Amino acid sequence: MSDNSVATPAHLLQAKVIFLSFLLTGGFVATYSAFNRHLRQITSVHDIPTNVFRRKYLYGKVTSVGDGDNFLFFHTPGGVLGGWHWLRKVPTLQRKGILPRRAQKATGNALSTLSPLNLFRGLVGLRSEGGGRDQFALYRGRRKLPTLSIRLCGVDAPERAHFGNSSQPLSEEAYKWLNKTLLGRFVWVKPLSTDQYGRCVAKVEYWSWFRWKNVSIELLKQGLGVVYESKSGAEFDGQDTLYRYHESKAKKSKRGVWGLRHFETPGAYKKRINKQ
C-alpha cells in the first residue's frame, strides 16, 4: 500500500481547521442575518423595511401620547425572548400621580423588577405601567427616546390646540382616553403607510386578558373619534366597513362627539383652519 493512500495526521488537522472555520463563519453570518431580520430594533419610521408594511407586526411599548390619535412607540422586537427587560433595557416612565395603596398594588410599575409574573406580563404584552379608573395618566410620557411616531389608522380624533388655534370640543377627553389606554402599555403595531408628517399610519392592537382590542375601533366606540374622512391616504387594513359600523353605533347612542349639538368633524375643522 502506497504512502499517499492514507491521510497523515497533518492533513486531517488541516481539513478539520478548514471545516470548523467554514462552520463558525456560516454560523456567525446566519446569526447576524437572523438578528437583523427578527431582533434588530427599529428606531425611526424611515428605517421600517418595506416588506414589513401591511404584512408584519412590530411589538413595543408606548412611551408618550401626543394627541387623541397618535403616540410614540419604543420597538422591543422579540419581547422578553428577545432579551428585553433582562439583557436589553426597556425605558421606564416617571410616576405622575399618587394612587391609594390598594390601587398602587394593582397598577404599579409592573416591569421594574424581574419577577416571573412581570416577565410573563412583558411576554404576552400586558401593561407595564398602570392605568386606573380615572382618566389621567399615572406616568409621564418620555419623548427623547429612539421611538417611532405612530398615527392610528382609520380614525380622526378632535383636534387639540396647536399653533395658536383653538381646540375642538372633547379633544382633551380623547387625549386623556388614549393616555389612559396606551401609555406604558405594550402593543402590536402593523405599519400600513407613512403620512405627510413622517408618521407611521398603523393598525394598533393590544391584549386585554380576554381578547385582542383594536385601538382605533375602541376610540370609535367611545365616540371620541370619527372615521377618517379623506379620500386619499385613508388606511383601514381592509376593515373600513367594521369601522363605519362602530361609528354608526356610537352616533345612534349619542356618545362623545355625537352628543354635541353643533359638531364639526376634525376633517372639516382642519379645512377651515387651513383657509384662514
UniProtKB/Swiss-Prot annotation:
Binding residues annotated for Ca(2+), in chain numbering: D156
Protein topology in the membrane: Single-pass membrane protein
Location (main, coarse): mitochondrion
EC number: 3.1.-.-
Localization: Mitochondrion; Membrane
Domain TNase-like: 56-260
Coiled-coil portions: none
Active site, per annotation: R151, E159, R199
Enzyme class, spelled out: hydrolase
Any one Gene Ontology cellular component term annotated for this protein: membrane
Gene Ontology MF annotations: endonuclease activity; metal ion binding
Transmembrane region(s): 10-32
Pfam hit, one: SNase
UniProt keywords, alphabetically: Calcium, Endonuclease, Hydrolase, Membrane, Metal-binding, Mitochondrion, Nuclease, Transmembrane, Transmembrane helix
PANTHER family membership: EBNA2 BINDING PROTEIN P100 (PTHR12302), SERINE_THREONINE-PROTEIN KINASE 31 (PTHR12302:SF3)
Family note: Belongs to the LCL3 family.
Protein name: Probable endonuclease LCL3
Species this protein is from: Eremothecium gossypii (strain ATCC 10895 / CBS 109.51 / FGSC 9923 / NRRL Y-1056) (Yeast)
Lineage: Eukaryota, Fungi, Dikarya, Ascomycota, Saccharomycotina
